């Protein structure tokens, strides 16, 4: 009860900040990949993966080379990001556990201060915190492989839904188009790519098994190479949707006043990677872009944690960080 009262009190302090004047605070677009290793982009050191849009984003912004997650598993990592707390503090530290309704997220603070807050794509945070957003367009996860090897719906192993919806990104641009134009935007855009299952034929020019870069701890077999090639294909598909978002921001003439952050929730879904404490499991790509504010084509070796994301977004919005946040 005390936590609930504290949350209500905090939001009541923010509400008076609203006014009828034009709100020129920056838009914030947060893009989160699903099971992408930190070094599997062209701009982070893997020239074998085709990621032209993310490479351009990095060239126009800053890449952090020492960015780490609090945990190397999907939903606990996301819960940690949205609450700026460590997994053992979220009560959602296990895979598929929902965030409890009494957890404070940075999103409701942005919303209370006047931001239009939306989420599109993979959700994976439970039903209790959906109301922190003005709108949530959750991706269809039919055929999405769970750790048991079963699909996410009805226990059947099926293919992902047809077409662009396989990526989880098909509603990214539509939800941006639907925003009210008189409010600053916060968008949580979450992909299903490059999470398993993998489908062949998703690209006109797929990556070739003989061209992939295998880590030294992976057996160099044709099976491994084919698996990595399909993983690369999903990264390239994700990159295409990132490009679509950038194009839409330009179309709406808000790109210059939009802060973009791109990360992954954990490492690649291969042995010794995801669910481990190796860099390939818990380290993340971390690319920021904000024209006229972030030095283009720059790198930082500063140590960054995913719990720092929420305080950074709040600072961009001119808001204070709650004391219960760890970042």
Predicted regions and their residues:
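Bacterial N-terminal signal peptides
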Residues: 5-16
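Formylglycine-dependent sulfatase
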Residues: 2-4, 18-327
